Amino acid sequence: MFVPISQIENLAQFKKEIFNGKIYVFEKSKITSHLVDQIKKKIGIDYSGELEKLHHFSNCEEMSTYLVANLKNTEIFKNLFYEFLNSINFLQGESYWDKFVVRVAPAINKFKYREASRIGVHRDTWGTNIHQQINWWAPISSIEETNTMVFFPDYFDRPVKNSSGSWDLNIYLENRKKGDFSYPSAPELLEKLPDNVRILPVTIKPGEILCFSGSHLHSSSKHKSENTRFSYEIRTVCQDDLDSKNEAPNIDCKLKWQFPKIFRNMKDNSPMKITS
């Protein structure tokens, strides 16, 4: 299901396949390797140890939280990612992205801060109600099946009970400004998936980049691990897809509104707007 690719030959066909559930893995390149190196370089200013062994330090939770905040939306990271998107022929017309986030997933799943923790089962589109959203995810350090991202591919077009109908991004953002993380950072799964559910763990290498629809049901793996995971992620939306309603199916998102304001124009940083 993870299809290797180096460059997009036909963007329309590529997006059609993404919005129908296909998951691509872009191969390692000079640009993506340089991006990983730059992230590691900035991490090294504050933490010079082995990334996978951060959890051995007594202050690992505080350090993880600090690193995530300090690395978020770093200009050189976004510039290099833009260069990557251009190199694979993804950029045609106006395009938008959210913040470039470096995430730390602890070896033991006990941290409270969302971007320095493991994430529960969700679709990213539950939080935006924008089904043209494409996700990009990549490891910075080596990963293993006990601490990675996992997909539930049989649920791409199968609904599950979730809290999107009562969740509000504005409430979360307001609480976050006050340092209050008690409100869920995203809508949550409200049912237990079967014990025999098919799970696809991601085992790509640093320098490779995963690309998939934000409508995929996915989560962090739940196992206790010997390694802390460092990864980065960003989401994109293209104006052409908004205009043409080229999108993944909305299976179970019940948000009352759409939340385009988290996306910004890649060129001039203006907020994305959606008109009926």
Please describe what each predicted stretch is.
Residues 48-53, 156-176, 252-271:
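Short, cationic low-complexity segments
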Residues 124, 198-200, 218-221:
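Generic recognition of flexible, low-complexity loop/linker segments
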Residues 86-150:
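Conserved double-stranded beta-helix
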Residues 1-91, 205, 272-276:
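N-terminal auxiliary "cap/dimerization" subdomain that precedes the catalytic jelly-roll/cupin core
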Residues 31-32, 107-109, 126, 141-144, ...:
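Short, solvent-exposed loop/turn segments at secondary-structure junctions
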Residues 134, 208, 230:
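Residue-level detector of short, conserved catalytic/binding motifs and their immediate flanks
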Residues 216-276:
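Non-heme Fe(II)/2-oxoglutarate
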Residues 146, 150-211:
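Double-stranded beta-helix
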